[in-house]
A protein has these predicted regions:
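Flexible, solvent-exposed loop/hinge segments and secondary-structure transition points
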Residues: 21-163
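Bacterial N-terminal signal peptides that target proteins for export
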Residues: 1-8
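N-terminal signal peptide c-region/cleavage motif recognized by signal peptidases
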Residues: 16-19
Length: 163
Protein backbone atom coordinates (compact mmCIF):
# COMPACT_ATOMS: atom_id res chain seq x y z
CA UNK A 1 0.00 0.00 0.00
CA UNK A 2 2.80 2.38 0.92
CA UNK A 3 4.50 1.72 -2.43
CA UNK A 4 1.24 2.45 -4.30
CA UNK A 5 0.95 5.87 -2.61
CA UNK A 6 4.52 6.77 -3.53
CA UNK A 7 3.97 5.66 -7.14
CA UNK A 8 0.74 7.66 -7.37
CA UNK A 9 2.38 10.78 -5.89
CA UNK A 10 5.36 10.45 -8.26
CA UNK A 11 3.09 10.07 -11.29
CA UNK A 12 0.98 13.09 -10.37
CA UNK A 13 4.11 15.16 -9.70
CA UNK A 14 5.60 14.31 -13.08
CA UNK A 15 2.46 15.22 -15.02
CA UNK A 16 1.76 18.36 -12.99
CA UNK A 17 5.26 19.79 -13.42
CA UNK A 18 5.78 18.94 -17.10
CA UNK A 19 3.91 22.03 -18.42
CA UNK A 20 5.89 24.25 -16.04
CA UNK A 21 9.18 22.95 -17.43
CA UNK A 22 8.17 23.49 -21.06
CA UNK A 23 9.42 26.84 -22.33
CA UNK A 24 9.21 28.73 -25.57
CA UNK A 25 12.32 28.74 -27.75
CA UNK A 26 14.79 31.49 -27.05
CA UNK A 27 14.86 34.16 -29.74
CA UNK A 28 17.95 36.35 -30.01
CA UNK A 29 19.02 39.12 -32.32
CA UNK A 30 22.15 38.47 -34.34
CA UNK A 31 24.09 39.85 -37.29
CA UNK A 32 22.66 39.02 -40.71
CA UNK A 33 24.90 38.56 -43.74
CA UNK A 34 23.37 41.64 -45.38
CA UNK A 35 24.07 43.72 -42.27
CA UNK A 36 27.65 42.43 -42.03
CA UNK A 37 28.32 43.30 -45.67
CA UNK A 38 26.80 46.78 -45.30
CA UNK A 39 28.97 47.48 -42.24
CA UNK A 40 32.08 46.28 -44.08
CA UNK A 41 31.28 48.45 -47.11
CA UNK A 42 30.66 51.53 -44.94
CA UNK A 43 33.88 50.91 -43.05
CA UNK A 44 35.97 50.44 -46.20
CA UNK A 45 34.39 53.51 -47.81
CA UNK A 46 35.30 55.71 -44.83
CA UNK A 47 38.85 54.41 -44.55
CA UNK A 48 39.41 54.74 -48.30
CA UNK A 49 38.11 58.31 -48.17
CA UNK A 50 40.56 58.98 -45.31
CA UNK A 51 43.41 57.40 -47.30
CA UNK A 52 43.79 54.16 -45.30
CA UNK A 53 44.04 50.59 -46.57
CA UNK A 54 42.38 48.30 -44.06
CA UNK A 55 40.97 44.86 -43.42
CA UNK A 56 37.60 44.49 -41.68
CA UNK A 57 36.07 41.63 -39.71
CA UNK A 58 32.52 41.31 -38.40
CA UNK A 59 31.84 38.80 -35.61
CA UNK A 60 28.37 37.69 -34.59
CA UNK A 61 26.77 37.43 -31.15
CA UNK A 62 28.77 34.28 -30.40
CA UNK A 63 32.07 35.90 -31.39
CA UNK A 64 32.32 33.87 -34.61
CA UNK A 65 33.41 35.46 -37.87
CA UNK A 66 30.32 36.45 -39.88
CA UNK A 67 32.20 38.26 -42.66
CA UNK A 68 35.76 39.35 -43.33
CA UNK A 69 37.41 41.39 -46.07
CA UNK A 70 41.07 42.10 -46.73
CA UNK A 71 41.49 45.49 -48.32
CA UNK A 72 43.69 46.04 -51.36
CA UNK A 73 47.31 46.64 -50.43
CA UNK A 74 46.99 45.70 -46.76
CA UNK A 75 49.60 43.81 -44.77
CA UNK A 76 48.89 40.11 -44.16
CA UNK A 77 48.57 40.54 -40.38
CA UNK A 78 45.61 42.91 -40.70
CA UNK A 79 43.11 40.07 -41.28
CA UNK A 80 43.83 38.33 -37.99
CA UNK A 81 44.30 41.57 -36.09
CA UNK A 82 40.92 42.88 -37.27
CA UNK A 83 39.31 39.62 -36.09
CA UNK A 84 40.88 39.92 -32.64
CA UNK A 85 39.72 43.53 -32.32
CA UNK A 86 36.15 42.59 -33.33
CA UNK A 87 36.15 39.66 -30.89
CA UNK A 88 37.43 41.87 -28.07
CA UNK A 89 34.71 44.45 -28.70
CA UNK A 90 32.06 41.71 -28.71
CA UNK A 91 33.10 39.86 -25.57
CA UNK A 92 33.83 43.03 -23.57
CA UNK A 93 30.76 44.93 -24.87
CA UNK A 94 32.93 48.00 -25.31
CA UNK A 95 35.47 49.33 -27.79
CA UNK A 96 38.85 47.65 -27.86
CA UNK A 97 40.29 51.12 -27.15
CA UNK A 98 38.35 51.13 -23.85
CA UNK A 99 39.74 47.66 -23.14
CA UNK A 100 43.25 48.98 -23.86
CA UNK A 101 42.75 51.70 -21.23
CA UNK A 102 41.39 49.15 -18.75
CA UNK A 103 44.46 46.96 -19.21
CA UNK A 104 46.71 49.85 -18.16
CA UNK A 105 45.33 49.41 -14.62
CA UNK A 106 47.36 46.70 -12.82
CA UNK A 107 44.20 45.63 -10.99
CA UNK A 108 42.67 44.66 -14.36
CA UNK A 109 45.69 42.53 -15.39
CA UNK A 110 43.69 39.25 -15.15
CA UNK A 111 41.80 40.38 -18.27
CA UNK A 112 44.98 39.64 -20.22
CA UNK A 113 44.35 35.94 -19.57
CA UNK A 114 41.22 35.90 -21.73
CA UNK A 115 42.15 34.08 -24.96
CA UNK A 116 41.81 36.32 -28.02
CA UNK A 117 41.53 39.58 -26.07
CA UNK A 118 43.61 42.47 -27.42
CA UNK A 119 44.19 45.89 -25.94
CA UNK A 120 44.47 47.88 -29.16
CA UNK A 121 41.99 50.33 -30.66
CA UNK A 122 39.96 49.46 -33.74
CA UNK A 123 37.22 47.17 -32.39
CA UNK A 124 33.67 48.46 -31.85
CA UNK A 125 30.69 46.51 -30.47
CA UNK A 126 27.54 46.31 -32.58
CA UNK A 127 24.61 47.05 -30.29
CA UNK A 128 20.92 46.49 -30.91
CA UNK A 129 18.90 48.12 -28.18
CA UNK A 130 20.58 47.28 -24.88
CA UNK A 131 22.31 44.15 -26.15
CA UNK A 132 25.53 43.54 -28.03
CA UNK A 133 24.94 41.41 -31.13
CA UNK A 134 28.42 41.47 -32.64
CA UNK A 135 31.58 43.41 -33.19
CA UNK A 136 33.50 45.20 -35.96
CA UNK A 137 37.27 45.07 -36.10
CA UNK A 138 39.40 47.26 -38.36
CA UNK A 139 43.15 47.04 -38.88
CA UNK A 140 45.49 48.95 -41.15
CA UNK A 141 44.99 52.65 -40.44
CA UNK A 142 47.87 54.38 -38.62
CA UNK A 143 46.46 54.12 -35.10
CA UNK A 144 43.57 52.41 -33.37
CA UNK A 145 41.58 55.64 -33.08
CA UNK A 146 41.49 55.92 -36.87
CA UNK A 147 40.49 52.27 -37.23
CA UNK A 148 37.71 52.88 -34.71
CA UNK A 149 36.43 55.94 -36.58
CA UNK A 150 36.09 53.82 -39.73
CA UNK A 151 34.26 51.08 -37.79
CA UNK A 152 31.82 53.63 -36.39
CA UNK A 153 31.14 54.90 -39.92
CA UNK A 154 30.35 51.33 -40.99
CA UNK A 155 27.95 50.78 -38.09
CA UNK A 156 26.25 54.10 -38.91
CA UNK A 157 25.24 52.59 -42.29
CA UNK A 158 22.93 50.10 -40.51
CA UNK A 159 21.93 52.27 -37.56
CA UNK A 160 18.21 52.22 -38.44
CA UNK A 161 18.14 48.41 -38.43
CA UNK A 162 19.74 48.27 -34.98
CA UNK A 163 16.95 50.15 -33.20
Amino acid sequence: MHFAKIALFTSISMFATAPVLAQAPQIEKNISMAMALAIIQGTIDQCTKDGYKVSVTIVDKGGNVAAQLRGDGTSPHTMEFSRLKAYTARIRNQTSLQTMKELEDPARAPLRQIPGLVGVGGGVPIKAGNGTIGGVGVSGAPGGEKDEACANAGIAKVEAALK
